[in-house]
Amino acid sequence: MILKYDVIVIGGGHAGCEAATAAANMGARTCLVTMDMNKIAQMSCNPAIGGIAKGQIVREIDALGGQMGLVTDKTAIQFRMLNRSKGPAVWSPRAQCDRGKFIWEWRSVLDNTPNLDIWQDQAEELLVEQAPSAVPSAASSAVPSVATESQQTRQVVGVKTIWGAELRAKSVIITAGTFLNGLMHIGRKQVPGGRIAEPAVLHFTESIARHGISYARMKTGTPVRIDRRSVHFEDMEVQPGENDYHQFSYMGAHRVLPQLPCWTCNTTPETHEILRSGLADSPLYNGQIQSTGPRYCPSIETKLVTFPDRQQHPLFLEPEGTDTNEMYLNGFSSSMPMEIQLEALRRIPALRDVRVYRPGYAIEYDYFDPTQLSHTLESKVISGLFFAGQVNGTTGYEEAGGQGTVAGINAALHCTGNQTFIMHRDDSYIGVLIDDLVTKGVDEPYRMFTSRAEYRILLRQDNADERLTEKAYQLGLATRERYDWWLQKKENIKRIVDFCNNTTVKPKQINGFLEAIGTATLHGSVKIADLIARPQINFSNLSEQLPALKEILHAAENRQEETAEAAEIHLKYKGYIERERVFAEKMHKLENIRIKGKFDYATINDLSTECRQKLERIQPETLAQASRIPGVSPSDINVLLVLLNK
């Protein structure tokens, strides 16, 4: 049987769901291939969305017209804004979600998306045909040129499934998560699988690799799941959420589900003693697992080996939902034998009678070298083939969702031969993520942090719609309703900012308040904007002194708190924002200098050997991208500039 589509998405995880809905909403006839329709967007590890830098990515997905933020708002059972003690550049929203409801909300989104079909099956073979070779870029006679490996001599035409169905399309997006040749480990026991009790996808990696696309192995893991009825909560510390819930979606609803607390406790020396006794059977330390795991989410056994003098490690017990007794023990990822895990847990006072639903386990899986991709996430080797999510060497639902959105957009554009959509380092964390992947590559699972972004003050969680919604609307991904919401918010912010810039405050109106909060009093009239710039002053306390300010802050019909927050940040940090924007614009000049196809790097002796090798392999699109490749020095960039100017 042959089924014809514009776009085929392989895998129904977070990358696949965002990719499928993005492509379909742009008008492409799309088919999402998944092994289990009842595990759409499964939270395979912790039941939470957002976190440091990750929350910004969710806001960006939403601003582009994606779905993760909307689904999170409908299923959140606890909210926290992380990094509140620091500046707004690094504030990051995070929500615990009801795992089961999260799946069904996503399933509802897919079922109600026009142009989108779901096919329950397993991909086995990538279908590829020869394509006309790309025409080499014209080069100056003074600059050596070479035909690069990035020229696509083949094009994807579809996939074949294990049941013999042939799905044909102009674009195929691979979002297979940890399922490609997945191998799970608990102690010395090894079982093929992509997730606990779910089969691995065999042979599909090889069908891709035979076309010249290289791959390697990575490892990840997940903790034990605990029965809440067996926990002694009196021996734990409660960790409630925050009341001022900030919706992830700019169009999201207010809290729907009842809010649940998390709980904290610590491991004990007795716990550590039992875990150490089982290290000989740990697949991480007996040679069973050779691949690299995530640096920033180590297993409990790795913590013991790395920090042997620590007497305790913090653990966080997180609810999985409102109607289940299953709880997630954050901080206790492990692949130790089952009996070791259970005995170690029972040496923690709060878990002395613990019962578990399933033990922690590790999983090894295939990923593809992301330097083989362009910034659209399309393969440099096979036209129309896109990759997104953990198959690119990343870790995290949010990183996957961001890549899926970009891949879905570009897969749809590829079908019509239209322009490509590229996100940049100064317009989004997604842009930082993709640029890091395709420029630097990965040798361990990649996780996003605010420290990876050089333009953090521009990439705040409060202004993702300002950065991206108009672009998404022009693409046809963001709806008119979403765009109108942004225009309304934009107008409300402008009204507040203009009021503060134009309204004068006299000393007699405000000096008593200023003295009470410990800041300098006024000797003459000043604008409200000048007062807001002071660290002790914010809209909340100042509006209590100035009724006219309170009135304009409350004038917005929707999302008053977030609108006021965005306006306050604009006023407080105006100088920093402008300075960073000027620097970003300077870097854009290098982004506009295209070098792809203009050099035979192997013949440029003035470049270092490492630089020549890296440039030959990665084939950067622009001079700016070349400057970010590890091993390419500023002097190497100057050599290329001299050659370009000849």
Task: State where each predicted segment sits.
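Short hydrophobic core segments
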Residues: 10, 166-177
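Extended, charge-enriched "interface" segments that sit outside catalytic cores
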Residues: 452, 469-638, 642-645
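Conserved N-terminal/central alpha/beta ligand/cofactor-binding core
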Residues: 21-125, 163, 175-195, 199, ...
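Core beta-strand elements of the Rossmann-like FAD/NAD(P) dinucleotide-binding domain
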Residues: 3-5, 162-171
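Conserved beta-strand-loop-beta-strand element in the redox core of flavoprotein oxidoreductases
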Residues: 127-132, 144-165
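An anion/pyrophosphate-binding glycine-rich loop and adjacent beta-alpha core
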Residues: 38, 206-342, 439-512, 516-524, ...
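Beta1/beta-strand and adjacent pyrophosphate-binding region of the FAD-binding site
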Residues: 2-15
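A glycine-rich dinucleotide-binding beta-alpha-beta segment and adjacent secondary-structure elements
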Residues: 328-394, 422-435, 560-614, 619
